[in-house]
Regions:
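Macromolecular interaction modules
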Residues: 1-115
Length: 115
């Protein structure tokens, strides 16, 4: 599985309209990517490690695809549409994008306390 992550840095004075992003941009992306998009999340930054500190990223988006080829075939034909819509929700026009291979963690079925 491939995860495409888009990170919008939290710069002083930058704008990000999360409402527009969730109600307009993401549905447009979902429609254009179709069945190739198998899942995803939109994470709104709350803080950094220190209490009361600004988050490093105002928004992080994670889109899941079966393969790199599935992502490229679905995404590349629509890049212009996605980029054209960016000024409608943000002035952060150069987000950081990373493509990762997802490795699943094996979690324990139960936990026990040694107290």
């Amino acid at each position: 599985m491939i995860k495409v992550s888009i990170f919008y840095a939290n710069r002083e004075g930058s704008k990000f309209d999360l409402s527009y992003y969730l109600k307009s941009h993401i549905p447009m992306v979902q429609k254009k990517l179709g069945a190739s998009l198998i899942g995803g999340t939109v994470d709104q930054g709350l803080s950094s490690v220190e209490p009361g500190s600004r988050p490093k990223f105002v928004v992080m988006v994670h889109l899941l695809f079966d393969s790199l080829e599935a992502f490229q075939n679905a995404f590349v034909p629509h890049v212009e549409s996605f980029m054209t819509d960016m000024p409608n929700y943000t002035d952060i026009l150069q987000p950081v994008i990373q493509i990762s291979e997802v490795k699943r963690l094996k979690l324990p079925l139960s936990t026990t306390s040694n107290t």
